[in-house]
A protein has these predicted regions:
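Functionally critical loop-and-helix segments that line ligand-binding/catalytic clefts
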Residues: 40-53, 58, 185-186, 190-246
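Membrane-interface segments at or immediately adjacent to transmembrane helices
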Residues: 60-66, 74
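Structural preference for beta-strand elements that scaffold enzyme active sites
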Residues: 43-45, 66-67, 96-98, 126-130, ...
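Membrane-interface motif at the C-terminal end of an N-terminal transmembrane signal
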Residues: 24-41
């Protein structure tokens, strides 16, 4: 016991100094983070589908969220059952709102774009349409030929641009990007899914415009079977965001 008392006394000052340094570092980090985010004015957004259930968009908009992408369609015969209510309600808030569709490799590019156009209104102030390009199912092991997919994408891009007056964005992951988009369609902005790094990098002449950095965020304001929500960040500050999507 006496030895313990002696050890505590001998080490008391260094321990207290260490604790003090730790506290200072914690406070410094908190202040740095606040300063960094306040000055960078980062622009955060969510993307949702029917899996999030009924969404209170006012509540979503009050949690530091600036934009939202809503699932609209898949292929040529599927519309997300909550798209219309989500679109209408989200546009009543101060959020910038856009829609996306999931690509079906078994159907034509032009037909899929037309089906999206049929279901997504052309309204001023909306974000550009998004083409969600991901390998799925059996295509994960046996990807479609690059020529086929590039022809499909070309049809989609041209059809959407003609209707909405702006180049669509392509959402994708690294696997699909490297398969079809690296060194191709360099005029098209990329929305990259990367939940494992702190600085996504794209090869082949592209810069990302949006980065999906988390698929497991929990926010207030929705009640669906999916408790998590996807989080995204714009590649720039609020000034750049407003300039790009005025």
């Amino acid at each position: 016991m006496e030895r313990l008392k002696t050890w505590v006394w001998d080490h008391k000052v260094p321990v207290l100094i260490g604790i003090g340094i730790l506290i200072v570092l914690i406070i410094a980090f908190a202040l740095w983070r606040t300063f960094y985010y306040d000055n960078k004015k980062i622009v955060l957004g969510v993307d949702v589908s029917a899996y999030q259930g009924e969404i209170d968009w006012e509540v979503i908009s009050e949690q530091g969220i600036s934009f939202a992408y809503i699932k609209a369609t898949e292929g040529t015969d599927f519309i997300d059952k909550r798209f219309n209510e989500n679109w209408t309600a989200a546009r009543k808030t101060n959020l910038k709102v856009g829609a996306y569709f999931f690509v079906n490799f078994n159907e034509g590019g032009k037909d899929q774009a037309k089906y999206f156009i049929k279901n997504v209104p052309k309204e001023s102030g909306s974000l550009p349409p998004v083409i969600d390009l991901e390998l799925y199912g059996d295509y994960l092991d046996n990807p479609p030929q690059k020529e086929k997919v590039n022809t499909m994408l070309k049809e989609m891009i041209e059809t959407l641009k003609e209707e909405y007056g702006e180049i669509p964005i392509i959402y994708t992951n690294y696997n699909t990007y490297n398969q079809y988009l690296s060194n191709a369609f360099t005029e098209v902005p990329i929305w990259i899914c990367d939940i494992s790094s702190s600085n996504p990098e794209l090869s082949g002449g592209h810069q990302w415009v949006f980065w999906q950095y988390s698929q497991r965020q929990i926010l207030q304001g929705y009640d669906g079977e999916e408790r998590f929500i996807d989080m995204n960040v714009f590649n720039g500050d609020t000034k750049a965001f407003k300039a790009m999507f005025n």
